[in-house]
Design a protein with these regions (language model features):
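PP2C/PPM-type serine/threonine phosphatase catalytic core
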Residues: 1-120
Length: 120
């Protein structure tokens, strides 16, 4: 696991302060909608990639990033509550990107956390 700021106590169990970076050439997605999900460990603790993919696909047609974020956070919280553990931070950012051509691209980004939401 990586995070943008180091955590000395967690370093002993493998947490690093070097971010994981992935570069993708969006030109190969011309005419398609791409979705990016960035979430805190409070989301990924119980919710896997396949589960997130199913939620993303549900909101894809309308490019409803806010609805997608809300459902991801809601489901994550439900998993935490069923686990009986204290609830970790739950934060999620979803971006739907529709690549049309090299001169134009549409971006819809919404962020929602367990405390409320922020739209960009």
């Amino acid at each position: 696991m990586s995070r943008s700021f180091g955590d000395k106590a967690a370093h002993s169990v493998g947490v690093i302060d070097e971010p994981e970076i992935i570069e993708i050439d969006i030109e190969k997605f011309e005419g398609k909608i791409v979705c990016v999900v960035v979430a805190s460990d409070g989301v990924w603790e119980f919710v896997g990639n396949e589960y997130i993919k199913n939620i993303v696909m549900k909101y894809l047609r309308e490019k409803n990033a806010k609805g997608c974020c809300e459902e991801i956070c809601k489901k994550s919280r439900e998993f935490w509550e069923r686990s009986g553990c204290a609830i970790d931070d739950i934060t999620c950012v979803v971006g739907y990107f529709e690549y049309e051509d090299s001169n134009k691209n549409n971006v819809i980004i919404n962020e929602i956390s367990d405390n409320g939401y922020f739209n960009m």
